[in-house]
Protein backbone atom coordinates (compact mmCIF):
# COMPACT_ATOMS: atom_id res chain seq x y z
CA UNK A 1 0.00 0.00 0.00
CA UNK A 2 1.18 3.53 -0.55
CA UNK A 3 0.36 6.94 -1.90
CA UNK A 4 3.09 8.17 -4.21
CA UNK A 5 2.54 10.68 -7.03
CA UNK A 6 -1.21 10.36 -6.43
CA UNK A 7 -1.05 6.58 -6.96
CA UNK A 8 -2.36 4.06 -4.44
CA UNK A 9 -1.64 0.34 -4.28
CA UNK A 10 -4.30 -2.03 -2.92
CA UNK A 11 -3.10 -5.51 -1.93
CA UNK A 12 -4.75 -8.81 -2.80
CA UNK A 13 -7.76 -9.85 -0.63
CA UNK A 14 -8.12 -6.23 0.43
CA UNK A 15 -10.28 -3.33 -0.71
CA UNK A 16 -9.76 0.39 -0.13
CA UNK A 17 -12.45 2.92 0.70
CA UNK A 18 -12.12 6.02 -1.49
CA UNK A 19 -13.51 9.34 -0.27
CA UNK A 20 -13.68 12.75 -1.90
CA UNK A 21 -13.65 15.63 0.54
CA UNK A 22 -14.75 13.18 3.28
CA UNK A 23 -17.63 11.65 1.34
CA UNK A 24 -17.68 8.02 0.26
CA UNK A 25 -17.13 7.70 -3.46
CA UNK A 26 -15.96 4.21 -4.39
CA UNK A 27 -14.49 0.88 -3.31
CA UNK A 28 -11.06 0.29 -4.81
CA UNK A 29 -10.20 -3.32 -5.67
CA UNK A 30 -6.67 -4.82 -5.54
CA UNK A 31 -4.25 -3.08 -7.90
CA UNK A 32 -2.90 0.41 -8.58
CA UNK A 33 -5.26 3.38 -8.53
CA UNK A 34 -4.87 7.08 -9.31
CA UNK A 35 -6.09 9.41 -6.56
CA UNK A 36 -5.48 13.12 -7.20
CA UNK A 37 -5.21 14.31 -3.63
CA UNK A 38 -5.27 17.87 -4.85
CA UNK A 39 -8.87 17.29 -5.96
CA UNK A 40 -9.86 15.99 -2.52
CA UNK A 41 -9.54 12.26 -3.27
CA UNK A 42 -8.07 10.09 -0.57
CA UNK A 43 -8.16 6.59 0.89
CA UNK A 44 -10.23 6.58 4.07
CA UNK A 45 -9.14 3.09 5.04
CA UNK A 46 -8.65 -0.50 4.02
CA UNK A 47 -10.89 -3.53 4.59
CA UNK A 48 -9.61 -7.12 4.58
CA UNK A 49 -11.70 -9.71 2.72
CA UNK A 50 -9.93 -12.64 4.35
CA UNK A 51 -11.74 -15.03 6.67
CA UNK A 52 -11.21 -13.99 10.27
CA UNK A 53 -11.78 -15.98 13.43
CA UNK A 54 -13.12 -14.84 16.76
CA UNK A 55 -13.18 -17.11 19.83
CA UNK A 56 -15.84 -16.15 22.33
CA UNK A 57 -15.91 -17.57 25.87
CA UNK A 58 -19.31 -17.31 27.50
CA UNK A 59 -20.16 -18.31 31.08
CA UNK A 60 -23.73 -19.42 31.67
CA UNK A 61 -25.83 -21.81 33.77
CA UNK A 62 -27.58 -25.00 32.69
CA UNK A 63 -31.08 -26.11 33.61
CA UNK A 64 -29.73 -28.24 36.47
CA UNK A 65 -27.88 -25.20 37.93
CA UNK A 66 -24.37 -26.08 36.75
CA UNK A 67 -22.15 -23.19 35.65
CA UNK A 68 -20.30 -23.87 32.40
CA UNK A 69 -17.97 -21.96 30.11
CA UNK A 70 -19.00 -22.38 26.48
CA UNK A 71 -16.33 -21.49 23.91
CA UNK A 72 -17.64 -20.60 20.44
CA UNK A 73 -15.40 -20.10 17.43
CA UNK A 74 -16.84 -17.71 14.80
CA UNK A 75 -15.36 -17.52 11.30
CA UNK A 76 -16.51 -14.47 9.33
CA UNK A 77 -15.45 -12.17 6.50
CA UNK A 78 -16.47 -8.91 4.87
CA UNK A 79 -18.34 -9.08 1.55
CA UNK A 80 -16.68 -7.25 -1.34
CA UNK A 81 -20.01 -6.07 -2.77
CA UNK A 82 -20.97 -4.59 0.62
CA UNK A 83 -17.59 -3.24 1.61
CA UNK A 84 -18.95 0.27 2.24
CA UNK A 85 -21.52 -1.12 4.72
CA UNK A 86 -18.85 -3.19 6.47
CA UNK A 87 -16.59 -0.16 6.77
CA UNK A 88 -19.06 2.54 7.75
CA UNK A 89 -21.89 0.82 9.64
CA UNK A 90 -19.88 -0.95 12.33
CA UNK A 91 -17.20 0.61 14.47
CA UNK A 92 -16.44 -2.58 16.45
CA UNK A 93 -17.18 -5.69 14.43
CA UNK A 94 -15.72 -8.17 16.92
CA UNK A 95 -17.59 -6.63 19.82
CA UNK A 96 -20.86 -6.79 17.88
CA UNK A 97 -20.37 -10.48 17.03
CA UNK A 98 -19.44 -11.26 20.63
CA UNK A 99 -22.63 -9.61 21.90
CA UNK A 100 -24.82 -11.73 19.61
CA UNK A 101 -22.98 -14.91 20.62
CA UNK A 102 -23.51 -14.12 24.31
CA UNK A 103 -27.19 -13.48 23.69
CA UNK A 104 -27.87 -16.75 21.84
CA UNK A 105 -25.80 -19.00 24.13
CA UNK A 106 -27.30 -17.54 27.31
CA UNK A 107 -30.77 -18.03 25.83
CA UNK A 108 -30.16 -21.64 24.70
CA UNK A 109 -28.02 -23.32 27.37
CA UNK A 110 -30.27 -22.56 30.41
CA UNK A 111 -33.00 -24.63 28.74
CA UNK A 112 -30.82 -27.76 28.69
CA UNK A 113 -29.41 -30.15 31.28
CA UNK A 114 -25.64 -30.45 31.45
CA UNK A 115 -25.54 -33.78 29.61
CA UNK A 116 -27.86 -32.40 26.93
CA UNK A 117 -25.54 -29.41 26.40
CA UNK A 118 -22.77 -31.80 25.34
CA UNK A 119 -25.11 -33.80 23.13
CA UNK A 120 -26.72 -30.78 21.46
CA UNK A 121 -23.69 -28.54 20.97
CA UNK A 122 -24.17 -28.71 17.19
CA UNK A 123 -27.72 -27.39 17.61
CA UNK A 124 -26.39 -24.55 19.76
CA UNK A 125 -23.77 -23.71 17.13
CA UNK A 126 -26.43 -23.72 14.42
CA UNK A 127 -28.64 -21.35 16.44
CA UNK A 128 -25.71 -18.97 16.97
CA UNK A 129 -24.83 -19.06 13.27
CA UNK A 130 -28.40 -18.36 12.16
CA UNK A 131 -28.73 -15.39 14.51
CA UNK A 132 -25.37 -13.96 13.47
CA UNK A 133 -26.16 -14.43 9.78
CA UNK A 134 -29.38 -12.45 10.12
CA UNK A 135 -27.74 -9.66 12.08
CA UNK A 136 -24.37 -9.32 10.35
CA UNK A 137 -25.58 -9.57 6.73
CA UNK A 138 -27.08 -6.10 7.13
CA UNK A 139 -23.61 -4.79 7.99
CA UNK A 140 -21.86 -6.36 5.01
CA UNK A 141 -20.44 -9.43 6.76
CA UNK A 142 -20.85 -13.14 6.03
CA UNK A 143 -20.70 -15.82 8.74
CA UNK A 144 -18.64 -18.63 7.23
CA UNK A 145 -18.91 -21.14 10.08
CA UNK A 146 -19.76 -21.32 13.76
CA UNK A 147 -18.38 -24.04 16.04
CA UNK A 148 -18.82 -24.84 19.72
CA UNK A 149 -15.25 -25.92 20.37
CA UNK A 150 -15.37 -26.47 24.13
CA UNK A 151 -17.78 -26.87 27.03
CA UNK A 152 -16.09 -26.56 30.42
CA UNK A 153 -18.11 -27.29 33.57
CA UNK A 154 -16.86 -26.29 37.00
CA UNK A 155 -13.86 -28.34 38.14
CA UNK A 156 -15.81 -29.97 40.99
CA UNK A 157 -18.56 -30.96 38.56
CA UNK A 158 -16.02 -32.46 36.15
CA UNK A 159 -14.50 -34.48 38.99
CA UNK A 160 -17.95 -35.72 40.05
CA UNK A 161 -18.82 -36.68 36.46
CA UNK A 162 -15.58 -38.64 36.15
CA UNK A 163 -16.28 -40.45 39.44
CA UNK A 164 -19.80 -41.34 38.28
CA UNK A 165 -18.44 -42.65 35.00
CA UNK A 166 -15.73 -44.65 36.79
CA UNK A 167 -18.30 -46.14 39.20
CA UNK A 168 -20.56 -47.14 36.31
CA UNK A 169 -17.66 -48.84 34.53
CA UNK A 170 -16.62 -50.66 37.71
CA UNK A 171 -20.20 -51.84 38.21
CA UNK A 172 -20.29 -53.10 34.63
CA UNK A 173 -16.96 -54.87 35.11
CA UNK A 174 -18.23 -56.50 38.33
CA UNK A 175 -21.36 -57.71 36.55
CA UNK A 176 -19.31 -59.14 33.71
CA UNK A 177 -16.95 -60.84 36.16
CA UNK A 178 -19.87 -62.34 38.11
CA UNK A 179 -21.44 -63.57 34.89
CA UNK A 180 -18.16 -65.18 33.86
CA UNK A 181 -17.81 -66.89 37.25
CA UNK A 182 -21.41 -68.10 36.98
CA UNK A 183 -20.74 -69.62 33.57
CA UNK A 184 -17.52 -71.18 34.90
CA UNK A 185 -19.35 -72.77 37.85
CA UNK A 186 -22.10 -74.08 35.56
CA UNK A 187 -19.55 -75.62 33.23
CA UNK A 188 -17.64 -77.07 36.19
CA UNK A 189 -20.87 -78.59 37.58
CA UNK A 190 -21.74 -80.00 34.17
CA UNK A 191 -18.26 -81.50 33.95
CA UNK A 192 -18.54 -83.02 37.43
CA UNK A 193 -21.97 -84.45 36.62
CA UNK A 194 -20.66 -86.01 33.43
CA UNK A 195 -17.61 -87.33 35.28
CA UNK A 196 -19.78 -88.88 38.00
CA UNK A 197 -22.06 -90.40 35.39
CA UNK A 198 -19.15 -92.01 33.58
CA UNK A 199 -17.63 -93.09 36.90
CA UNK A 200 -20.95 -94.71 37.85
CA UNK A 201 -21.01 -96.58 34.57
CA UNK A 202 -17.49 -97.81 35.22
CA UNK A 203 -18.30 -98.92 38.77
CA UNK A 204 -21.45 -100.70 37.58
CA UNK A 205 -19.49 -102.57 34.91
CA UNK A 206 -16.76 -103.39 37.41
CA UNK A 207 -19.27 -104.82 39.89
CA UNK A 208 -21.00 -106.74 37.13
CA UNK A 209 -17.67 -108.27 36.15
CA UNK A 210 -16.96 -109.16 39.80
CA UNK A 211 -20.37 -110.79 40.17
CA UNK A 212 -19.86 -112.76 36.97
CA UNK A 213 -16.40 -113.87 38.12
CA UNK A 214 -17.67 -114.89 41.55
CA UNK A 215 -20.50 -116.86 40.01
CA UNK A 216 -18.13 -118.72 37.72
CA UNK A 217 -15.74 -119.38 40.62
CA UNK A 218 -18.51 -120.72 42.85
CA UNK A 219 -19.85 -122.99 40.14
CA UNK A 220 -16.39 -124.23 39.17
CA UNK A 221 -15.34 -124.88 42.78
CA UNK A 222 -18.57 -126.75 43.56
CA UNK A 223 -18.05 -129.00 40.53
CA UNK A 224 -14.38 -129.71 41.19
CA UNK A 225 -14.69 -130.21 44.97
CA UNK A 226 -17.58 -132.60 45.73
CA UNK A 227 -19.45 -132.09 49.01
CA UNK A 228 -18.99 -128.30 49.18
CA UNK A 229 -21.92 -125.99 49.18
CA UNK A 230 -22.32 -122.52 47.68
CA UNK A 231 -22.17 -121.10 51.22
CA UNK A 232 -18.74 -122.64 51.84
CA UNK A 233 -17.40 -121.28 48.58
CA UNK A 234 -18.79 -117.78 49.29
CA UNK A 235 -17.21 -117.73 52.76
CA UNK A 236 -13.87 -118.65 51.27
CA UNK A 237 -14.15 -115.96 48.58
CA UNK A 238 -15.03 -113.31 51.16
CA UNK A 239 -12.05 -114.28 53.32
CA UNK A 240 -9.78 -114.12 50.26
CA UNK A 241 -11.06 -110.67 49.33
CA UNK A 242 -10.67 -109.52 52.94
CA UNK A 243 -6.98 -110.45 52.98
CA UNK A 244 -6.45 -108.85 49.56
CA UNK A 245 -7.95 -105.62 50.90
CA UNK A 246 -5.77 -105.66 54.01
CA UNK A 247 -2.74 -106.25 51.80
CA UNK A 248 -3.54 -103.23 49.62
CA UNK A 249 -4.05 -100.99 52.67
CA UNK A 250 -0.74 -102.09 54.16
CA UNK A 251 1.14 -101.63 50.86
CA UNK A 252 0.28 -97.92 50.60
CA UNK A 253 1.92 -95.42 52.96
CA UNK A 254 -0.69 -92.69 52.36
CA UNK A 255 -3.89 -94.69 52.27
CA UNK A 256 -7.07 -93.54 54.02
CA UNK A 257 -9.18 -96.36 55.39
CA UNK A 258 -12.14 -96.86 57.72
CA UNK A 259 -11.26 -99.47 60.35
CA UNK A 260 -13.84 -102.19 60.87
CA UNK A 261 -13.66 -105.47 62.79
CA UNK A 262 -10.97 -107.44 61.00
CA UNK A 263 -10.92 -110.89 62.48
CA UNK A 264 -12.00 -113.97 60.44
CA UNK A 265 -15.09 -114.26 62.63
CA UNK A 266 -16.05 -110.72 61.75
CA UNK A 267 -15.79 -111.62 58.09
CA UNK A 268 -18.16 -114.53 58.72
CA UNK A 269 -20.59 -112.10 60.37
CA UNK A 270 -20.39 -109.77 57.38
CA UNK A 271 -21.00 -112.70 55.05
CA UNK A 272 -24.02 -113.74 57.11
CA UNK A 273 -25.42 -110.22 56.94
CA UNK A 274 -24.95 -110.12 53.18
CA UNK A 275 -26.61 -113.51 52.69
CA UNK A 276 -29.50 -112.60 54.99
CA UNK A 277 -30.01 -109.37 53.08
CA UNK A 278 -30.04 -111.19 49.76
CA UNK A 279 -32.45 -113.83 51.05
CA UNK A 280 -34.80 -111.18 52.45
CA UNK A 281 -34.70 -109.33 49.15
CA UNK A 282 -35.51 -112.53 47.26
CA UNK A 283 -38.42 -113.29 49.63
CA UNK A 284 -39.82 -109.79 49.17
CA UNK A 285 -39.70 -110.19 45.40
CA UNK A 286 -41.58 -113.49 45.64
From Swiss-Prot:
Lipidation (N-myristoyl glycine): 2
Gene Ontology cellular component annotations, sorted alphabetically: Golgi apparatus; plant-type vacuole; plasma membrane; plasmodesma; plastid
Keywords: Cell membrane, Coiled coil, Lipoprotein, Membrane, Myristate
GO molecular function: protein histidine kinase binding
UniProt-listed Pfam families: Band_7 (PF01145)
Subcellular location: Cell membrane
Membrane topology according to the record: Lipid-anchor
Coiled-coil boundaries: 114-190
PANTHER family: HYPERSENSITIVE-INDUCED RESPONSE PROTEIN 1, STOMATIN-LIKE PROTEIN 2, MITOCHONDRIAL
Function: Positive regulator of hypersensitive response (HR)-like cell death. May be involved in potassium ion channel regulation.
Assembly with partners or alone: Self-interacts and forms heteromers. Interacts with NB-LRR class of R proteins before R proteins (e.g. RPS2 or RPM1) are activated by the effectors. Interacts with LRR1.
Protein name: Hypersensitive-induced response protein 1
Species this protein is from: Arabidopsis thaliana
